[in-house]
Amino acid sequence: MGVLSLVVLASSNLRAQDAAIGNSPLSQAASRAVMNVAASGYVGNAACARCHASIYESYESTAMAHASGPAMDALTPAEFTHKESGVHYRIYSENGRAWLSFERPGDPEVRGRRELLYYIGSGRRGRSYLFETDGFLFESPVNWYTDKQVWDMAPAYQTSREMPLNLPAYASCLHCHVSEMQPPAKGTDDRYPNPPFLHNGVSCERCHGPGAEHVAGGKIVNPEKLSPGRRDEVCMQCHMEGKVAIEQPGRHAYEFRPGGELSDYVRYFVLAGSQTQGLGAVSQVEALAQSQCKKKSGDRMWCATCHDPHFSPAAEDRVAYYRARCLACHGSAFAVKHHPDQPDCVSCHMPASQSSDVAHTEVTDHRILRRPQVEPQLLQDPSQEASLPKLVPFPANGNRESNPRDLALAWESLVESGMSAGESQAQSLLEKASEKSPNDPALLSALGYIEQKHGKAERARSFYQRALAIDPDLVDAASNLAVIEAKSANSRAAVALWQRAFQLAPGRSEIGLDLAREYCLSGKIDEARDVMLRVLEFNPDLGAAKGMLRRLNRASPSCEP
Protein backbone atom coordinates (compact mmCIF):
# COMPACT_ATOMS: atom_id res chain seq x y z
CA MET A 1 0.00 0.00 0.00
CA GLY A 2 1.27 3.48 -0.83
CA VAL A 3 1.84 6.55 1.28
CA LEU A 4 -0.30 9.68 0.81
CA SER A 5 2.00 12.51 1.83
CA LEU A 6 1.33 16.16 2.62
CA VAL A 7 4.67 17.11 1.06
CA VAL A 8 4.90 16.43 -2.68
CA LEU A 9 8.41 15.42 -3.74
CA ALA A 10 9.64 16.62 -7.11
CA SER A 11 11.46 13.31 -7.49
CA SER A 12 12.21 10.23 -5.46
CA ASN A 13 15.95 10.74 -5.16
CA LEU A 14 18.66 11.63 -2.63
CA ARG A 15 22.32 12.31 -1.27
CA ALA A 16 24.62 11.52 1.76
CA GLN A 17 27.51 12.30 4.09
CA ASP A 18 30.50 10.05 4.65
CA ALA A 19 29.16 7.45 7.09
CA ALA A 20 31.46 5.64 9.47
CA ILE A 21 30.23 2.15 8.66
CA GLY A 22 33.48 0.34 8.05
CA ASN A 23 33.44 -1.23 11.49
CA SER A 24 29.71 -1.88 11.57
CA PRO A 25 28.39 -5.40 12.17
CA LEU A 26 27.19 -5.71 8.57
CA SER A 27 30.57 -4.56 7.27
CA GLN A 28 32.36 -7.13 9.40
CA ALA A 29 29.96 -9.86 8.27
CA ALA A 30 30.55 -9.04 4.60
CA SER A 31 34.30 -9.46 4.98
CA ARG A 32 34.03 -13.00 6.31
CA ALA A 33 34.21 -16.14 4.23
CA VAL A 34 31.02 -17.82 3.06
CA MET A 35 29.08 -18.78 6.16
CA ASN A 36 27.75 -22.33 6.07
CA VAL A 37 25.90 -21.91 9.34
CA ALA A 38 23.40 -24.66 10.05
CA ALA A 39 19.95 -23.18 10.54
CA SER A 40 16.65 -25.02 10.35
CA GLY A 41 18.36 -28.10 8.94
CA TYR A 42 20.70 -26.34 6.51
CA VAL A 43 24.23 -27.70 6.22
CA GLY A 44 25.84 -25.61 3.46
CA ASN A 45 27.47 -26.45 0.14
CA ALA A 46 30.62 -27.90 1.68
CA ALA A 47 28.63 -30.78 3.14
CA CYS A 48 27.15 -31.50 -0.30
CA ALA A 49 30.56 -31.36 -1.99
CA ARG A 50 31.95 -34.17 0.16
CA CYS A 51 29.79 -36.75 -1.63
CA HIS A 52 28.88 -34.91 -4.84
CA ALA A 53 32.25 -33.45 -5.77
CA SER A 54 31.84 -33.51 -9.56
CA ILE A 55 28.36 -31.97 -9.46
CA TYR A 56 29.55 -29.34 -7.00
CA GLU A 57 32.55 -28.47 -9.16
CA SER A 58 30.33 -28.13 -12.21
CA TYR A 59 27.77 -26.05 -10.34
CA GLU A 60 30.46 -23.64 -9.17
CA SER A 61 30.83 -22.52 -12.81
CA THR A 62 27.18 -21.43 -13.05
CA ALA A 63 25.73 -17.96 -12.64
CA MET A 64 23.46 -19.04 -9.78
CA ALA A 65 26.40 -20.17 -7.67
CA HIS A 66 27.83 -16.65 -7.85
CA ALA A 67 24.63 -14.62 -7.57
CA SER A 68 25.98 -12.74 -4.53
CA GLY A 69 29.05 -12.37 -2.37
CA PRO A 70 31.43 -9.90 -0.71
CA ALA A 71 31.77 -6.76 -2.84
CA MET A 72 35.56 -7.05 -2.98
CA ASP A 73 35.22 -10.40 -4.75
CA ALA A 74 33.62 -8.76 -7.80
CA LEU A 75 34.62 -5.13 -8.11
CA THR A 76 35.49 -3.35 -11.37
CA PRO A 77 37.14 -0.05 -10.40
CA ALA A 78 36.03 2.91 -12.50
CA GLU A 79 34.62 6.41 -12.36
CA PHE A 80 32.04 8.29 -14.37
CA THR A 81 29.83 11.37 -14.27
CA HIS A 82 26.08 11.00 -14.57
CA LYS A 83 25.09 13.71 -17.04
CA GLU A 84 21.54 14.39 -15.81
CA SER A 85 22.40 14.81 -12.12
CA GLY A 86 25.96 16.07 -12.51
CA VAL A 87 27.13 13.64 -9.82
CA HIS A 88 30.58 12.12 -10.27
CA TYR A 89 30.89 8.54 -9.02
CA ARG A 90 34.06 6.62 -8.27
CA ILE A 91 34.16 2.89 -7.55
CA TYR A 92 37.42 1.75 -5.96
CA SER A 93 39.10 -0.42 -3.31
CA GLU A 94 41.07 0.81 -0.33
CA ASN A 95 42.79 -1.32 2.30
CA GLY A 96 40.91 -4.42 1.21
CA ARG A 97 37.48 -2.78 1.24
CA ALA A 98 35.21 -1.68 -1.61
CA TRP A 99 33.95 1.90 -1.79
CA LEU A 100 31.61 4.11 -3.77
CA SER A 101 32.36 7.83 -3.56
CA PHE A 102 30.20 10.59 -4.98
CA GLU A 103 30.35 14.34 -5.41
CA ARG A 104 28.72 17.06 -7.45
CA PRO A 105 31.27 19.75 -8.34
CA GLY A 106 30.26 23.06 -6.78
CA ASP A 107 27.77 21.44 -4.39
CA PRO A 108 29.45 20.68 -1.03
CA GLU A 109 26.27 19.01 0.26
CA VAL A 110 26.66 16.19 -2.26
CA ARG A 111 29.98 14.69 -1.30
CA GLY A 112 30.74 11.49 0.55
CA ARG A 113 31.22 7.78 0.22
CA ARG A 114 29.67 4.46 1.18
CA GLU A 115 31.38 1.15 1.78
CA LEU A 116 30.06 -1.48 -0.61
CA LEU A 117 29.46 -4.64 1.40
CA TYR A 118 27.98 -7.19 -1.00
CA TYR A 119 27.55 -7.64 -4.71
CA ILE A 120 24.23 -8.88 -6.09
CA GLY A 121 24.16 -10.55 -9.50
CA SER A 122 26.45 -13.10 -11.12
CA GLY A 123 27.96 -10.65 -13.57
CA ARG A 124 26.57 -12.43 -16.63
CA ARG A 125 24.28 -9.44 -17.16
CA GLY A 126 25.47 -7.11 -14.47
CA ARG A 127 25.82 -6.46 -10.76
CA SER A 128 24.37 -4.23 -8.12
CA TYR A 129 25.98 -3.55 -4.77
CA LEU A 130 24.69 -3.14 -1.22
CA PHE A 131 25.73 -0.71 1.49
CA GLU A 132 24.53 0.12 4.98
CA THR A 133 23.28 3.33 6.53
CA ASP A 134 22.67 3.09 10.28
CA GLY A 135 21.85 -0.60 10.10
CA PHE A 136 19.55 -0.38 7.08
CA LEU A 137 20.61 -2.08 3.86
CA PHE A 138 20.37 -0.21 0.55
CA GLU A 139 21.18 -0.81 -3.09
CA SER A 140 23.86 1.27 -4.72
CA PRO A 141 22.59 4.02 -7.04
CA VAL A 142 25.01 2.75 -9.71
CA ASN A 143 25.27 -0.71 -11.25
CA TRP A 144 27.77 -2.57 -13.39
CA TYR A 145 26.29 -3.60 -16.77
CA THR A 146 28.21 -6.45 -18.35
CA ASP A 147 26.83 -6.36 -21.90
CA LYS A 148 28.17 -2.85 -22.48
CA GLN A 149 30.97 -3.03 -19.90
CA VAL A 150 29.87 0.19 -18.23
CA TRP A 151 28.89 1.59 -14.86
CA ASP A 152 25.62 3.49 -15.00
CA MET A 153 22.62 4.40 -12.87
CA ALA A 154 20.36 1.78 -11.34
CA PRO A 155 17.24 0.83 -13.34
CA ALA A 156 14.61 3.61 -13.49
CA TYR A 157 17.12 6.28 -12.48
CA GLN A 158 18.85 6.87 -15.81
CA THR A 159 17.42 10.39 -16.12
CA SER A 160 17.15 11.29 -12.44
CA ARG A 161 18.39 14.77 -11.60
CA GLU A 162 19.02 13.79 -7.97
CA MET A 163 21.15 10.99 -6.57
CA PRO A 164 19.04 8.02 -5.37
CA LEU A 165 20.90 6.85 -2.29
CA ASN A 166 17.97 5.33 -0.41
CA LEU A 167 16.96 2.37 -2.58
CA PRO A 168 15.95 -0.28 -0.01
CA ALA A 169 17.28 -3.81 -0.37
CA TYR A 170 13.92 -5.55 -0.10
CA ALA A 171 13.86 -9.17 1.04
CA SER A 172 11.46 -9.99 -1.80
CA CYS A 173 14.26 -9.20 -4.28
CA LEU A 174 17.32 -10.06 -2.22
CA HIS A 175 16.27 -13.63 -1.43
CA CYS A 176 16.66 -14.76 -5.05
CA HIS A 177 20.36 -13.89 -5.05
CA VAL A 178 21.34 -15.27 -1.64
CA SER A 179 20.71 -18.33 0.48
CA GLU A 180 19.41 -18.72 4.02
CA MET A 181 17.91 -15.24 4.00
CA GLN A 182 17.45 -13.72 7.43
CA PRO A 183 14.12 -11.92 7.96
CA PRO A 184 14.23 -8.13 8.38
CA ALA A 185 13.35 -6.65 11.76
CA LYS A 186 9.62 -6.49 12.44
CA GLY A 187 7.98 -3.52 10.82
CA THR A 188 10.97 -2.77 8.57
CA ASP A 189 11.68 -3.63 4.96
CA ASP A 190 15.46 -3.48 4.97
CA ARG A 191 16.94 -3.75 8.47
CA TYR A 192 18.43 -7.22 8.75
CA PRO A 193 20.20 -9.26 11.42
CA ASN A 194 23.96 -9.66 11.26
CA PRO A 195 24.64 -11.11 8.71
CA PRO A 196 21.61 -10.60 6.42
CA PHE A 197 22.12 -14.00 4.79
CA LEU A 198 24.12 -17.06 5.75
CA HIS A 199 25.36 -18.26 2.37
CA ASN A 200 26.53 -16.37 -0.69
CA GLY A 201 24.89 -17.16 -4.01
CA VAL A 202 22.18 -19.72 -4.69
CA SER A 203 23.22 -22.73 -2.65
CA CYS A 204 22.43 -26.40 -3.27
CA GLU A 205 19.73 -26.23 -0.61
CA ARG A 206 17.81 -23.44 -2.36
CA CYS A 207 16.65 -26.06 -4.88
CA HIS A 208 16.95 -29.24 -2.82
CA GLY A 209 15.82 -28.01 0.58
CA PRO A 210 17.62 -28.34 3.94
CA GLY A 211 20.19 -31.12 3.79
CA ALA A 212 20.71 -32.17 7.42
CA GLU A 213 18.43 -35.20 7.17
CA HIS A 214 20.09 -36.28 3.92
CA VAL A 215 23.59 -35.97 5.37
CA ALA A 216 22.46 -38.19 8.24
CA GLY A 217 21.39 -40.85 5.75
CA GLY A 218 17.86 -39.73 4.95
CA LYS A 219 16.10 -38.25 1.96
CA ILE A 220 16.32 -34.89 0.24
CA VAL A 221 14.18 -33.14 -2.35
CA ASN A 222 14.95 -33.93 -5.97
CA PRO A 223 12.92 -31.39 -7.97
CA GLU A 224 12.76 -33.70 -10.98
CA LYS A 225 10.86 -36.29 -8.93
CA LEU A 226 8.26 -33.89 -7.58
CA SER A 227 4.81 -33.50 -9.09
CA PRO A 228 4.93 -31.14 -12.10
CA GLY A 229 3.44 -28.24 -10.14
CA ARG A 230 5.80 -28.55 -7.18
CA ARG A 231 8.73 -29.17 -9.54
CA ASP A 232 8.08 -26.01 -11.54
CA GLU A 233 7.70 -23.92 -8.39
CA VAL A 234 11.31 -24.60 -7.43
CA CYS A 235 12.31 -22.47 -10.43
CA MET A 236 9.28 -20.18 -10.25
CA GLN A 237 10.25 -18.89 -6.81
CA CYS A 238 12.85 -16.70 -8.52
CA HIS A 239 12.12 -16.72 -12.25
CA MET A 240 8.51 -15.52 -12.08
CA GLU A 241 7.57 -11.92 -11.43
CA GLY A 242 4.06 -11.43 -12.80
CA LYS A 243 2.19 -8.14 -12.74
CA VAL A 244 1.51 -8.40 -9.00
CA ALA A 245 2.75 -10.76 -6.29
CA ILE A 246 0.79 -11.03 -3.02
CA GLU A 247 2.38 -12.61 0.03
CA GLN A 248 0.14 -14.67 2.28
CA PRO A 249 -0.77 -13.58 5.84
CA GLY A 250 2.17 -14.16 8.15
CA ARG A 251 4.23 -15.64 5.31
CA HIS A 252 7.00 -14.37 3.06
CA ALA A 253 8.30 -15.56 -0.30
CA TYR A 254 11.79 -16.16 1.12
CA GLU A 255 10.37 -18.76 3.55
CA PHE A 256 9.42 -21.14 0.72
CA ARG A 257 11.17 -24.52 0.77
CA PRO A 258 11.46 -26.88 -2.24
CA GLY A 259 8.78 -29.54 -2.19
CA GLY A 260 6.32 -27.21 -0.52
CA GLU A 261 3.56 -25.26 -2.20
CA LEU A 262 4.67 -21.83 -3.35
CA SER A 263 1.12 -20.46 -3.16
CA ASP A 264 1.26 -20.99 0.61
CA TYR A 265 3.72 -18.10 0.64
CA VAL A 266 3.07 -15.92 -2.39
CA ARG A 267 0.55 -15.81 -5.22
CA TYR A 268 1.14 -14.27 -8.62
CA PHE A 269 -1.23 -12.43 -10.93
CA VAL A 270 -0.81 -11.61 -14.61
CA LEU A 271 -2.89 -9.68 -17.11
CA ALA A 272 -5.13 -12.04 -19.07
CA GLY A 273 -4.19 -12.28 -22.73
CA SER A 274 -1.00 -10.26 -22.38
CA GLN A 275 2.16 -11.32 -24.14
CA THR A 276 4.10 -9.97 -21.18
CA GLN A 277 4.63 -6.24 -21.05
CA GLY A 278 8.00 -6.27 -22.68
CA LEU A 279 10.59 -8.84 -21.71
CA GLY A 280 11.39 -8.32 -18.07
CA ALA A 281 14.60 -9.60 -16.50
CA VAL A 282 12.69 -12.20 -14.45
CA SER A 283 9.75 -13.00 -16.73
CA GLN A 284 11.01 -16.35 -18.03
CA VAL A 285 8.32 -18.57 -16.49
CA GLU A 286 5.47 -16.38 -17.71
CA ALA A 287 7.01 -16.10 -21.18
CA LEU A 288 7.57 -19.86 -21.46
CA ALA A 289 3.93 -20.50 -20.55
CA GLN A 290 2.94 -18.53 -23.66
CA SER A 291 5.09 -20.64 -25.98
CA GLN A 292 3.59 -23.28 -28.25
CA CYS A 293 6.36 -25.63 -27.11
CA LYS A 294 5.07 -25.51 -23.55
CA LYS A 295 1.39 -25.50 -24.48
CA LYS A 296 1.73 -28.63 -26.62
CA SER A 297 4.21 -30.42 -24.38
CA GLY A 298 2.36 -29.72 -21.16
CA ASP A 299 3.97 -31.04 -17.99
CA ARG A 300 6.64 -32.88 -19.96
CA MET A 301 8.40 -29.58 -20.55
CA TRP A 302 9.95 -27.57 -17.75
CA CYS A 303 13.02 -25.43 -17.19
CA ALA A 304 15.40 -28.41 -16.94
CA THR A 305 14.25 -29.68 -20.34
CA CYS A 306 16.66 -27.12 -21.78
CA HIS A 307 18.72 -26.01 -18.78
CA ASP A 308 20.96 -28.15 -16.60
CA PRO A 309 20.93 -26.31 -13.25
CA HIS A 310 24.32 -27.83 -12.36
CA PHE A 311 26.09 -26.87 -15.59
CA SER A 312 26.64 -23.91 -17.89
CA PRO A 313 28.12 -24.62 -21.34
CA ALA A 314 31.14 -22.61 -22.42
CA ALA A 315 30.39 -19.74 -24.80
CA GLU A 316 31.83 -21.61 -27.78
CA ASP A 317 29.66 -24.66 -27.00
CA ARG A 318 26.31 -22.97 -26.42
CA VAL A 319 24.96 -23.15 -29.98
CA ALA A 320 25.52 -26.89 -30.22
CA TYR A 321 24.40 -27.50 -26.64
CA TYR A 322 21.02 -25.79 -26.99
CA ARG A 323 20.52 -27.06 -30.55
CA ALA A 324 20.74 -30.57 -29.11
CA ARG A 325 18.04 -29.65 -26.60
CA CYS A 326 15.75 -28.50 -29.42
CA LEU A 327 16.44 -31.59 -31.54
CA ALA A 328 15.55 -33.86 -28.65
CA CYS A 329 11.94 -32.95 -29.46
CA HIS A 330 12.01 -31.69 -33.04
CA GLY A 331 14.20 -34.40 -34.58
CA SER A 332 17.22 -34.29 -36.84
CA ALA A 333 15.24 -34.88 -40.05
CA PHE A 334 13.22 -31.73 -39.39
CA ALA A 335 16.33 -29.73 -38.60
CA VAL A 336 18.14 -30.74 -41.79
CA LYS A 337 15.23 -29.44 -43.89
CA HIS A 338 14.81 -26.38 -41.69
CA HIS A 339 17.54 -23.79 -42.34
CA PRO A 340 20.42 -26.24 -42.89
CA ASP A 341 22.86 -23.33 -43.03
CA GLN A 342 21.76 -21.95 -39.66
CA PRO A 343 22.57 -24.31 -36.76
CA ASP A 344 21.71 -21.76 -34.08
CA CYS A 345 18.06 -22.34 -33.13
CA VAL A 346 18.13 -19.84 -30.27
CA SER A 347 19.29 -16.79 -32.22
CA CYS A 348 16.20 -17.00 -34.46
CA HIS A 349 13.50 -18.39 -32.19
CA MET A 350 14.65 -17.07 -28.81
CA PRO A 351 16.51 -13.87 -29.70
CA ALA A 352 18.02 -11.66 -27.05
CA SER A 353 16.20 -8.36 -26.72
CA GLN A 354 16.56 -5.27 -24.58
CA SER A 355 15.08 -5.88 -21.14
CA SER A 356 12.00 -3.76 -20.44
CA ASP A 357 13.00 -3.18 -16.82
CA VAL A 358 16.82 -3.22 -16.67
CA ALA A 359 18.88 -0.80 -18.76
CA HIS A 360 21.86 -1.96 -20.86
CA THR A 361 20.72 -5.57 -20.47
CA GLU A 362 19.41 -8.12 -22.96
CA VAL A 363 17.25 -11.10 -22.05
CA THR A 364 16.43 -14.25 -23.96
CA ASP A 365 12.88 -14.44 -25.28
CA HIS A 366 11.38 -17.56 -23.70
CA ARG A 367 8.20 -17.33 -25.79
CA ILE A 368 10.07 -19.43 -28.41
CA LEU A 369 8.34 -17.73 -31.33
CA ARG A 370 7.97 -19.70 -34.56
CA ARG A 371 8.37 -16.53 -36.60
CA PRO A 372 10.20 -14.12 -34.33
CA GLN A 373 10.19 -11.36 -36.91
CA VAL A 374 6.38 -11.22 -36.50
CA GLU A 375 6.02 -10.02 -32.93
CA PRO A 376 2.69 -10.56 -31.14
CA GLN A 377 1.06 -7.31 -30.16
CA LEU A 378 2.12 -6.37 -26.66
CA LEU A 379 -0.54 -5.21 -24.23
CA GLN A 380 0.04 -1.62 -23.24
CA ASP A 381 0.48 -0.54 -19.65
CA PRO A 382 -2.84 -1.08 -17.82
CA SER A 383 -2.82 2.44 -16.43
CA GLN A 384 -3.18 3.68 -20.01
CA GLU A 385 -6.05 1.38 -20.99
CA ALA A 386 -9.54 2.74 -21.63
CA SER A 387 -11.13 -0.43 -20.27
CA LEU A 388 -10.05 -2.46 -17.27
CA PRO A 389 -7.79 -5.42 -17.98
CA LYS A 390 -8.51 -8.79 -16.42
CA LEU A 391 -6.21 -9.86 -13.65
CA VAL A 392 -5.81 -13.64 -13.35
CA PRO A 393 -3.79 -15.91 -11.06
CA PHE A 394 -0.66 -17.61 -12.40
CA PRO A 395 -0.45 -20.47 -13.00
CA ALA A 396 -4.11 -20.49 -14.03
CA ASN A 397 -4.42 -24.22 -13.36
CA GLY A 398 -2.62 -24.17 -10.04
CA ASN A 399 -3.60 -26.48 -7.23
CA ARG A 400 -5.25 -23.64 -5.36
CA GLU A 401 -7.70 -21.10 -6.60
CA SER A 402 -6.94 -17.52 -5.71
CA ASN A 403 -8.92 -16.41 -2.68
CA PRO A 404 -10.79 -13.07 -2.59
CA ARG A 405 -8.10 -11.49 -0.41
CA ASP A 406 -5.34 -12.05 -2.96
CA LEU A 407 -7.29 -10.64 -5.90
CA ALA A 408 -8.46 -7.64 -3.86
CA LEU A 409 -4.93 -6.76 -2.75
CA ALA A 410 -3.65 -7.30 -6.28
CA TRP A 411 -6.13 -4.75 -7.61
CA GLU A 412 -5.23 -2.30 -4.85
CA SER A 413 -1.59 -2.70 -5.92
CA LEU A 414 -2.51 -1.79 -9.50
CA VAL A 415 -4.32 1.31 -8.23
CA GLU A 416 -1.27 2.28 -6.22
CA SER A 417 0.91 1.90 -9.33
CA GLY A 418 -1.23 4.41 -11.19
CA MET A 419 -4.27 2.63 -12.61
CA SER A 420 -6.85 5.00 -11.15
CA ALA A 421 -9.60 3.48 -13.31
CA GLY A 422 -9.39 0.38 -11.13
CA GLU A 423 -10.29 2.11 -7.86
CA SER A 424 -13.94 1.02 -7.88
CA GLN A 425 -12.96 -2.55 -8.74
CA ALA A 426 -10.38 -2.59 -5.97
CA GLN A 427 -12.79 -1.17 -3.40
CA SER A 428 -15.52 -3.65 -4.26
CA LEU A 429 -13.16 -6.61 -4.00
CA LEU A 430 -11.60 -5.33 -0.78
CA GLU A 431 -15.00 -4.91 0.86
CA LYS A 432 -16.05 -8.44 -0.08
CA ALA A 433 -12.75 -9.89 1.10
CA SER A 434 -12.92 -8.02 4.41
CA GLU A 435 -16.34 -9.51 5.10
CA LYS A 436 -14.68 -12.93 5.19
CA SER A 437 -11.52 -11.70 6.93
CA PRO A 438 -12.57 -8.71 9.06
CA ASN A 439 -9.34 -8.68 11.08
CA ASP A 440 -6.83 -8.83 8.24
CA PRO A 441 -4.64 -5.72 8.68
CA ALA A 442 -3.54 -5.73 5.04
CA LEU A 443 -7.14 -5.56 3.84
CA LEU A 444 -8.03 -2.88 6.39
CA SER A 445 -5.03 -0.77 5.40
CA ALA A 446 -5.86 -1.14 1.71
CA LEU A 447 -9.46 -0.08 2.33
CA GLY A 448 -8.21 2.94 4.24
CA TYR A 449 -5.98 3.87 1.31
CA ILE A 450 -8.83 3.67 -1.22
CA GLU A 451 -11.22 5.65 1.01
CA GLN A 452 -8.57 8.27 1.64
CA LYS A 453 -7.98 8.67 -2.10
CA HIS A 454 -11.73 9.23 -2.45
CA GLY A 455 -11.61 11.97 0.18
CA LYS A 456 -13.57 9.99 2.79
CA ALA A 457 -11.34 10.79 5.75
CA GLU A 458 -13.54 9.42 8.54
CA ARG A 459 -14.00 6.04 6.87
CA ALA A 460 -10.29 5.90 6.09
CA ARG A 461 -9.43 6.79 9.70
CA SER A 462 -11.58 3.93 10.98
CA PHE A 463 -9.92 1.38 8.71
CA TYR A 464 -6.41 2.57 9.57
CA GLN A 465 -7.11 2.55 13.30
CA ARG A 466 -8.45 -0.99 13.12
CA ALA A 467 -5.41 -2.11 11.13
CA LEU A 468 -2.95 -0.48 13.53
CA ALA A 469 -4.73 -1.96 16.55
CA ILE A 470 -3.88 -5.37 15.11
CA ASP A 471 -0.39 -4.51 13.84
CA PRO A 472 1.04 -1.20 15.13
CA ASP A 473 4.10 -1.54 12.87
CA LEU A 474 2.28 -0.91 9.57
CA VAL A 475 4.34 1.99 8.25
CA ASP A 476 2.02 3.01 5.40
CA ALA A 477 -1.11 2.84 7.53
CA ALA A 478 0.49 4.93 10.28
CA SER A 479 1.80 7.54 7.87
CA ASN A 480 -1.47 7.82 5.96
CA LEU A 481 -3.47 8.11 9.17
CA ALA A 482 -1.06 10.84 10.28
CA VAL A 483 -1.99 12.83 7.17
CA ILE A 484 -5.67 12.60 8.14
CA GLU A 485 -4.94 13.66 11.72
CA ALA A 486 -2.79 16.59 10.59
CA LYS A 487 -5.52 17.84 8.26
CA SER A 488 -7.94 17.54 11.17
CA ALA A 489 -5.68 19.77 13.31
CA ASN A 490 -4.88 16.83 15.59
CA SER A 491 -1.16 17.58 15.61
CA ARG A 492 -0.24 15.45 18.62
CA ALA A 493 -1.72 12.30 17.08
CA ALA A 494 -0.16 13.06 13.70
CA VAL A 495 3.29 13.54 15.20
CA ALA A 496 3.09 10.30 17.20
CA LEU A 497 2.12 8.34 14.09
CA TRP A 498 4.81 9.89 11.88
CA GLN A 499 7.43 9.40 14.59
CA ARG A 500 6.74 5.67 14.71
CA ALA A 501 6.65 5.34 10.93
CA PHE A 502 9.88 7.30 10.49
CA GLN A 503 11.61 5.25 13.18
CA LEU A 504 10.81 2.07 11.25
CA ALA A 505 11.58 3.54 7.83
CA PRO A 506 14.06 6.43 8.05
CA GLY A 507 14.87 6.00 4.38
CA ARG A 508 11.30 6.97 3.46
CA SER A 509 11.89 10.66 2.81
CA GLU A 510 8.25 11.66 2.42
CA ILE A 511 7.50 10.52 5.97
CA GLY A 512 10.35 12.58 7.42
CA LEU A 513 9.32 15.64 5.43
CA ASP A 514 5.76 15.41 6.73
CA LEU A 515 6.96 14.95 10.31
CA ALA A 516 9.35 17.91 10.09
CA ARG A 517 6.65 20.15 8.66
CA GLU A 518 4.25 19.22 11.47
CA TYR A 519 6.93 19.92 14.08
CA CYS A 520 7.58 23.28 12.44
CA LEU A 521 3.90 24.24 12.37
CA SER A 522 3.78 23.41 16.09
CA GLY A 523 6.70 25.76 16.75
CA LYS A 524 9.18 22.94 17.41
CA ILE A 525 11.89 24.18 15.06
CA ASP A 526 14.77 22.25 16.67
CA GLU A 527 12.86 18.98 16.36
CA ALA A 528 12.05 19.79 12.74
CA ARG A 529 15.75 20.42 12.00
CA ASP A 530 16.73 17.12 13.62
CA VAL A 531 14.27 15.25 11.42
CA MET A 532 15.57 16.98 8.29
CA LEU A 533 19.14 16.05 9.20
CA ARG A 534 17.98 12.46 9.62
CA VAL A 535 16.32 12.53 6.19
CA LEU A 536 19.51 13.90 4.64
CA GLU A 537 21.58 11.22 6.36
CA PHE A 538 19.81 8.74 4.11
CA ASN A 539 18.92 11.00 1.15
CA PRO A 540 21.56 13.74 0.99
CA ASP A 541 20.65 14.96 -2.51
CA LEU A 542 16.92 15.31 -1.87
CA GLY A 543 16.06 18.83 -3.00
CA ALA A 544 12.89 19.08 -0.92
CA ALA A 545 14.80 18.19 2.26
CA LYS A 546 17.71 20.54 1.54
CA GLY A 547 15.29 23.36 0.82
CA MET A 548 13.28 22.78 3.99
CA LEU A 549 16.44 22.69 6.12
CA ARG A 550 17.58 26.01 4.66
CA ARG A 551 14.20 27.58 5.47
CA LEU A 552 14.30 26.16 9.00
CA ASN A 553 17.73 27.72 9.53
CA ARG A 554 16.56 31.24 8.66
CA ALA A 555 16.20 33.89 11.33
CA SER A 556 12.46 33.64 10.72
CA PRO A 557 11.93 29.94 9.93
CA SER A 558 9.43 28.94 7.28
CA CYS A 559 7.49 25.69 7.43
CA GLU A 560 6.59 25.45 3.76
CA PRO A 561 8.15 22.53 1.86
Where are these regions (language model features)?
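Primarily the internal scaffold of c-type cytochrome electron-transfer domains
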Residues: 18-39, 46, 54-122, 126-133, ...
